[in-house]
From Swiss-Prot:
GO terms for cellular component: plasma membrane. One of its GO terms (biological process) is protein catabolic process. This is ATP-dependent zinc metalloprotease FtsH. The active site is at E469. Residues 1-17 have a biased composition (Basic and acidic residues). Residues 1-27, 88-111, 651-706 are annotated as: Disordered. ATP binds at G246, P247, P248, G249, T250, G251, K252, T253. CDD domains: RecA-like_FtsH. Residues 51-150 are periplasmic. It comes from Anaeromyxobacter dehalogenans (strain 2CP-1 / ATCC BAA-258).
Length: 706
């Protein structure tokens, strides 16, 4: 198929997707409930406007006077009105007091030479002597019991019709089908999938940098969609479904769009949460409609983002499920079994919670292949930075390779945010180029939060923060297995951080030893120990340090088998990898006696870390005071100045001096970098998590006392 034919195919697919498919005639505007409401309102206006054209209204008192004068040929009495037909008047005839009304009837009250009937509003209730007056005058009269068909229409038919039309309009709006397919109340079961053709995606694999392995896996999908005979002649079967898993912000949606852009096929994109709404059975109907549309457009790609919202496990132990979601999932499973893989229909899903997906969804024949879209390494980060910096005017001092080295653990979305923040900072400062200073400030914003220049702290608290951060830096500097210190600051940042110690490694690492964990915990306790040694007591600013040190110790004892007392056993609850870095509901599978032993070992490890930190602080008290004094003077101290004050960092034998190490946190935080206090040790419950930049804060909790 030529490019022009593909383009034409794409244009046909973009037109109305009603029951008649492409080429369906446009809807008549009068079929819209809103149009009917306008027509009814116009009819009411016209009826009211012309209601009194054929009659002449007069006051009720004048009507009674004309009855007494026998001016009417006949009278009709209604529930709240009376109508009188005037007698024919010969030319020049006029009598007594009735002359004036008769002249009016002959003059301005004429139509086709006939006098118009007179109509007056009758006084309701008793005491009305109109009937007696009519009988006395000898005028024939009649009575109407009800309001006739007019009243029936306005009292009953019109309000009901307006209410039904308004309800239909509301249901149409709620169904979300305006401009997206067949309108009306029955459109709830229609899929909300948006069709993106190749010109619309505008993304190819060249835009998906830093995830080369994932691109290589998906290249097979592209080649199958372009040349399926290459695989069919050897008896191969392309996977029906591809599941993209990985942390947030790593480019899963971008990769799916790039796959469709490379293949040049229709791209159905929707979220898993769009299947389930207020009515039971809507989700299953939308699944059926989605696959019906996709089969007509094959070869094509159907991309379901946030698949966990739809495909959560049906296990009763997992909270949050209900019958509607289960029915929708069952329909999806049936549809994925039902379509023929040879038709060229590829299902792609994306999730960052693969551990909660239903096993039936992941079996071969449905989502055959899982592609990990992980955080990029140093080389990948550099490639991503170059893509996002293509339209940014960089200064001569900007080295993107150095920026990539200073951003371990950053996902693609975070790197895009860094470039954008740097450009905004340069524009705010009225610069012509984005310099290295803006990139460093942007990284610091992501790691530690925004500067709180308006937060004023007194001299006593400022001195405590200075010694606290100097304690963190000193212990980490003097222990061989701790991370190198990049920057120390006592400028308040974020929600509750009054200061921070920034540690940015130069390399990516994925394993930790027991010695590295012990030195990490000692560095965490360095701030609290420095406060005790200088001021005689700790402050609330060390609360977050204690939380993270305890978390590291507990994982060493319970998950990693690093406690001599308990031995090489794992007591943690293994539920599979979690890319969100948060724990669900934990179940304890050991006795109370073992739990008490775990608590004792955790306490022993934390106390050991505190003793080691205290030894370092006491041995190097002069260096601690020198850095604290420097912080009180200039507030921010870089690594080069720390080296001039203390000398080179103590490193383990066999390593390059000053070369840092990076380890993952015990539970990967939601943000790609450790922006909370002392996020600093261990790796995930099910294996090493991606490396993280470290920022130790004083006053980590947003507490007024901190």
């Amino acid at each position: 198929m030529s490019a022009d034919e593909k383009k034409g195919h794409g244009q046909r697919s973009e037109r109305g997707r009603g029951p008649g498919g492409p080429g369906t005639q446009p809807r008549i505007p009068l079929a819209s409930p809103a149009a009917w409401l306008v027509l009814i309102a116009l009819a009411i206006f016209l009826f009211r406007a012309f209601q009194d054209v054929g009659v002449r209204r007069i006051p009720y008192s004048q009507f009674k006077e004309m009855v007494r004068q026998s001016a009417f040929e006949r009278v009709v009495i209604g529930p709240d009105w009376v109508r009188g037909v005037p007698k024919p008047v010969e030319a020049g005839a006029a009598q007594g007091g009735g002359a004036q009304p008769q002249q009016q009837a002959q003059g301005e009250g004429e139509r086709n030479g006939q006098a118009l009937p007179y109509v007056a509003t009758r006084i309701p209730g008793g005491g009305d002597d109109l009937v007696q007056a009519v009988e006395k005058a000898g005028v024939p009269y009649d009575a109407v019991a009800g309001g006739g068909m007019g009243d029936l229409f306005w009292v009953w038919i019109a309000p009901i019709a307006i209410g039904l039309l308004f309800w239909a309009w509301v249901m149409r709006r709620m169904s979300g089908q305006l401009g997206q397919g067949p309108p009306g109340v029955m459109a709830f079961g229609k899929s909300r999938a948006r069709i993106h053709m190749e010109p619309d995606t505008g993304v190819t694999f060249q835009d998906a940098a830093g995830i080369d392995e994932a691109v290589e896996e998906l290249q097979e999908i592209v080649e199958f969609l372009k040349t399926p005979e290459k695989y069919r002649r050897l008896g191969g079967r392309i996977p029906k479904g591809v599941l993209l898993v990985g942390p947030p912000g790593t480019g899963k949606t971008l990769l799916a769009r790039a796959t469709a852009g490379e293949a040049g096929v229709p791209f159905f994109s929707l979220s898993g949460s769009e299947f389930v709404e207020m009515f039971v059975g809507v989700g299953a109907a939308r699944v059926r409609d989605l696959f019906a549309q996709a089969t007509q457009k094959a070869p094509c790609i159907v991309f379901i983002d946030e698949l966990d919202a739809l495909g959560k496990s049906r296990n009763a132990g997992i909270m949050g499920g209900h019958d509607e979601r289960e029915q929708t999932l069952n329909q999806l499973l049936a549809e994925m079994d039902g379509f023929d893989a040879r038709a060229g229909l590829i299902i792609m899903g994306a999730t960052n919670r693969p551990e909660i997906l239903d096993p039936a969804l992941l079996r071969p024949g449905r989502f055959d292949r899982q592609v990990l879209v992980d955080r990029p390494d140093k080389r990948g980060r550099e490639q991503i930075l170059r893509i996002h910096a293509r339209n940014v005017k960089l200064g001569p001092d900007v080295d993107l390779r150095s920026v990539a080295a200073r951003t371990p653990g950053f996902a693609g979305a975070d790197l895009a945010n860094v470039v954008n923040e740097a450009a905004l900072l340069a524009a705010r400062r009225n610069k012509n180029h984005v310099t290295r200073a803006e990139f460093e400030e942007a990284i610091e914003r992501v790691v530690a939060g925004l500067e709180k220049k308006s937060r004023r702290i007194n001299e006593r608290e400022k001195e405590i923060v200075a010694f606290h951060e100097a304690g963190h830096a000193l212990v980490s500097w003097m222990l061989p297995f701790a991370d190198r210190v990049s920057k120390v600051s006592i400028i308040p940042r974020g929600l509750g951080a009054l200061g921070y110690t920034l540690q940015l490694p130069l390399e990516d690492r994925y394993l930790l030893t027991r010695s590295e964990l012990r030195d990490r915990m000692a560095g965490l306790m360095g701030g609290r120990v420095a406060e005790e040694e200088v001021f005689g007591e700790p402050s609330t600013g060390a609360s977050n340090d204690l939380q993270h040190a305890t978390a590291v110790a507990r994982m060493m004892v319970r998950d990693y088998g690093m406690s001599p007392a308990l031995g090489p056993v794992s007591l943690g609850d293994q539920n599979g990898p979690s890319f969100l870095g948060v724990k669900g509901f934990e179940t304890r599978s050991y006795s109370d006696h073992t739990a008490l032993a775990v608590d004792r070992e955790v306490q022993a490890l934390v106390e050991e870390a505190q003793d080691r930190a205290r030894t370092v602080v006491r041995e190097h008290r002069e260096r601690l005071e020198a850095l604290a004094a420097r912080l009180l003077t200039i507030e921010v101290v870089e690594e080069d100045e720390i080296t001039r004050l203390w000398g080179p960092k103590v490193v383990r034998p066999g390593t390059i001096e000053g070369r840092g190490h990076e380890e993952s946190p015990p539970e990967t935080p939601n943000r790609p970098v450790a922006a909370s206090a002392d996020a600093s040790a261990g790796f995930g419950r099910s294996g090493p998590q991606p490396p993280q930049a470290l920022a130790r804060h004083a006053g980590g909790d947003p507490d007024p006392e901190s």
